[in-house]
Regions:
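Binuclear metal-ion centers of metallo-dependent hydrolases, dominated by the metallo-beta-lactamase
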Residues: 1-6, 116, 130-206, 211-216, ...
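His/Asp/Glu-rich metal-coordinating catalytic cores
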Residues: 2-28, 32-34, 40-160, 167, ...
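Short acidic low-complexity segments
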Residues: 11, 19-28, 204-220, 234-238
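Short coil/turn segments at beta-strand junctions that form active-site/ligand-binding loops
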Residues: 18, 31, 49, 95, ...
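Short internal beta-strands
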Residues: 49-59, 123, 180-191, 249, ...
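Active-site-adjacent beta-strand anchor residues
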Residues: 51-54, 162-163, 270, 295-296
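Active-site-proximal loop/helix segment associated with metal-binding centers of metalloenzymes
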Residues: 86-95, 103, 107-108, 121-128, ...
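C-terminal regulatory/interaction regions
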Residues: 211-325
Length: 325
């Protein structure tokens, strides 16, 4: 029977014997600290306590200058579950509790859809926990973007594909890796090279600094995968001014009317590393959970919708809860 609560240090699941910290901000001296993946907002400050994490986040964290000390990928009575968010991302199943971390239940290139385990208590993210967030199939997105690129290539226009440096950029590198030539922003190249060393089948290429120094960017058209950045960024300004590049930004927020995706890109494409609304609903159904806690996103709205559907759901807040599991 664990008490689940949200604290300033993340989610704590405690009983009289031990505490499990889910994506904590700081590592304590005692307890088990689960790190779901290597996005910066999920990496904890250093500490001496035990860290449970898959091997991939450790290597990615090191590339980003973060060391996960005392880390293991296996502990008795704890099961790591592929979450499909980014490479190496996991959810955690323990004591009939399933914590999703950031999760996606759709295939996207080398990333495979998360499989939802049965549990009594579900702690789920709901980044896109409003009905307006329903994303098109990945096959439809790939077809649309390939048509855009083909049209631009016919006009001699180079293309920048913009997505988060870790996660989205690797997906874009694979989904659109057949275009030639393809280059990578230097930061994306470093991340891609690390992924390739861990077995991810990404096309090898050079970084933008080398490509520019060799005059390769003058030989248009080309495709480049770069981190998400606004039109005001100096890199984008330079690429626009010197090479007349066309930018395509990828985000789950791309089609939102209320929460507009405003980075000043020429095209905005709704591709996400998270579940959309319908996928979140299906996730909850597949878990067969008796109790659902919503975190990260539209927690109140999504919990209300779940209750209307007959589930027992509530947002997880920074107070002790009277509900136990």
């Amino acid at each position: 029977m664990r008490n689940i609560r949200l604290t300033k240090n993340g989610i704590e699941c405690s009983d009289s014997v031990s505490t499990v910290y889910l994506d904590p901000k700081k590592i304590q001296n005692q307890g088990v600290h689960f790190v779901s993946h290597a996005h910066i907002d999920h990496l904890p400050n250093s500490g001496d306590g035990t860290i449970l994490s898959s091997t991939e986040p450790n290597k990615i964290a090191q590339l980003r200058g973060v060391t996960l000390k005392n880390s293991t990928d296996s502990l008795e009575n704890f099961t790591l579950v592929d979450s499909g968010h980014i490479f190496g991302s996991k959810g955690l199943l323990f004591d009939d509790i399933f914590y999703t971390g950031d999760i996606s239940t759709r295939d996207r290139g080398f990333l495979k859809a998360a499989k939802i385990p049965k549990c009594k208590t579900l702690i789920t993210e709901c980044t896109f926990g409003l009905p307006e967030f329903v994303l098109p199939p990945v096959t439809e997105i790939v077809k649309q973007v390939n048509e855009i690129i083909a049209n631009l290539y016919s006009k001699g226009k180079p293309v920048l594909l913009l997505g988060y440096e870790l996660g989205k950029a690797q997906t874009l590198s694979q989904l659109f890796g057949d275009w030639d030539p393809i280059y990578y922003h230097d930061s994306v190249k470093k991340m891609n090279d690390l992924h390739r060393s861990m077995g991810v089948p990404l096309k090898d290429s050079i970084g933008h600094t080398e490509a520019e120094s060799k005059g390769l960017l003058d030989k248009k058209p080309w495709v480049m995968v770069a981190p998400m950045m606004s039109a005001k960024n100096n890199f984008i300004k330079h690429m626009k001014t010197k090479y007349d590049v066309i930018t395509i930004g990828f985000s789950g927020w791309a089609n939102s009317k209320k929460f507009g995706f405003s980075r000043g890109t020429d095209y905005s494409i709704p591709l996400s590393d998270h579940c959309d609304y319908n996928e979140l609903i299906q996730l909850v159904k597949e878990s067969e959970a008796e109790r659902v806690y919503t975190i990260h996103g539209f927690v109140d709205e999504f919990a209300l919708d779940l209750n209307k559907l007959g589930f027992s759901a509530q947002p997880l807040r920074e107070i002790s809860l009277d509900n136990f599991c």
